[in-house]
């Protein structure tokens, strides 16, 4: 309780100080200049952990490695060899700290530095569904760097460091994954029994604000955690099968059946169903190389039906743009968010969710051998580029009117470390990079 109070006090001071004291210190408007400034800020040698940007610099969010910077080692986004070294070193430093937290049984939404190499693990408002997912995402980034064609020595060094970390902390990660599996609860619906991580109480995913139970995004995160744990060799699938009473393929089919019974992915089963448009949310897209693999026609059909609902509904986008809001309506929130940051994960547009929406669209097109969504994906990315130049940096979120998101207590972050993911998906959508450098 005391640790939570201290962590909350530190965060309150940080956010309010940032809201009223932060100034813009650069005059850049060109996308290349903005990107270079962001990379110099996010991966500065003085940084001890990879964070979004102000005001989040005083807290560490493990989930962000899955949601917001899943491929910072993409060579197409790296400016030069120094940039590569800074990224690899900061990623390794961050992942090691997170693994130490797992070893200490601290699997929380947030880690708050408390001075002198001391840290406080805190769950803001609810327990996480995606903290282990973020830690595994960081490890996957390090180890999979060898799969990318790169001339940077730092990449191969990062691969080696990732393998050493995996070997050192494999037992701790396995224990944490089994603990997560043991926390799943039975949920009965139409005579069938499903396993949910939030059947009786909310769990957070992507951010801490939403207060609903039985959400698709939270349970998709748990499924993906199990799959990545198996693929990294941390845990054997048969051991998970014994714990869950079903294999992972069946577990995924169950989630699609439960949340997709209406023919689209319903955001939450908490409360009576509303209209289809009010029942979906943009975070259904999940994370990079996560829940959606698009290999099955039935899965693609559910994705397409949900995507089409969002694309066709005017309330889901900022007028005249391809900026899609998280929800057509504001969700049920904790009281503090209603007061301090209304619409934070509701009627606001998150560039990162839009980037992942575009990437899932491209996944759909690739597996269905079509160009169904390519133009929509390109439209999303074009408008994010425009917003980045207009607002002088890559935004954490944008208001429903297309402005910087601000409230009396919060001034949305310039999300420096989220910028590379945008460039990666831009190249995929257009076939050519948006920016190029000569090392």
What name fits each language-model region?
Residues 58-189, 219, 347-364, 374-377, ...:
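Aromatic-rich carbohydrate-recognition surfaces in CAZymes
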Residues 1-2:
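Universal eukaryotic N-terminal targeting presequences
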Residues 208-220, 224:
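Flexible, acidic/His-enriched mid-domain "rim/lid" segments that flank
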Residues 8, 12-60, 93-122, 179-213, ...:
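Extended glycan-interaction surfaces of carbohydrate-active proteins
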Residues 62, 74, 78, 145-148, ...:
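Alpha-helix C-terminal capping/termination sites
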Residues 233-242, 296-300, 360-375, 436-437:
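Acidic, serine/threonine/proline-rich low-complexity intrinsically disordered regions
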Residues 221-252:
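Active-site neighborhood of glycoside hydrolase catalytic domains
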């Amino acid at each position: 309780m005391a640790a939570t109070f201290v962590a909350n006090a530190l965060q309150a001071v940080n956010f309010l100080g940032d809201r009223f004291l932060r100034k813009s210190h650069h005059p850049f408007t060109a996308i290349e200049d903005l990107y270079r400034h962001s990379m110099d800020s996010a991966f500065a040698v003085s940084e001890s952990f990879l964070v979004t940007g102000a005001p989040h610099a005083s807290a560490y969010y493990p989930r962000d490695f899955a949601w917001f910077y899943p491929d910072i080692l993409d060579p197409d986004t790296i400016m030069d060899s120094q940039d590569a070294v800074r990224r690899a070193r900061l990623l390794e430093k961050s992942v090691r700290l997170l693994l130490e937290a797992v070893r200490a049984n601290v699997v929380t939404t947030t880690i708050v530095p408390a001075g002198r190499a001391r840290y406080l693990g805190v769950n803001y408002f609810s327990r996480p569904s995606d903290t282990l997912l973020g830690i595994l995402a960081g490890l996957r980034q390090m180890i999979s760097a060898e799969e990318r064609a790169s001339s940077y020595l730092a990449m191969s060094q990062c691969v080696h460091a990732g393998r050493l970390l995996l070997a050192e902390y494999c037992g701790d990660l396995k224990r944490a994954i089994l603990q997560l599996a043991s926390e799943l609860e039975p949920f009965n619906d139409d005579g069938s029994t499903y396993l949910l991580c939030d059947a009786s109480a909310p769990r957070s995913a992507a951010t801490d604000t939403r207060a609903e139970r039985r959400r698709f995004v939270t349970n998709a995160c748990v499924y993906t955690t199990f799959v990545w744990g198996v693929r990294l060799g941390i845990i054997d699938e048969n051991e998970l099968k014994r714990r869950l009473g079903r294999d992972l393929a069946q577990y995924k089919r169950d989630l699609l059946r439960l949340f997709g019974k209406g023919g689209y992915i319903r955001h939450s089963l908490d409360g009576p169903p509303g209209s289809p448009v009010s029942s979906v949310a943009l975070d259904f897209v999940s994370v990079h190389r996560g829940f959606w693999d698009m290999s099955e026609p039935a899965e693609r059909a559910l994705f397409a039906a949900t995507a089409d609902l969002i694309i066709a509904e005017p309330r889901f986008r900022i007028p005249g743009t391809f900026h899609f809001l998280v929800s057509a309506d504001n969700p049920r929130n904790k009281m503090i968010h209603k007061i301090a940051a209304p619409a934070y994960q509701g009627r606001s547009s998150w560039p990162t969710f839009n980037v992942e929406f575009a990437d899932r669209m491209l996944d759909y097109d690739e597996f269905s051998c079509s160009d169904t969504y390519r133009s929509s994906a390109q439209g999303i990315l074009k408008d994010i580029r425009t917003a980045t130049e207009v607002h002088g940096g890559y935004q954490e979120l944008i208001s429903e009117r297309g402005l910087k998101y601000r409230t009396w207590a919060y001034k949305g972050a310039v999300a420096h470390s989220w910028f590379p993911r945008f460039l990666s998906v831009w190249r995929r959508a257009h076939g050519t990079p948006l920016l190029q450098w000569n090392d």
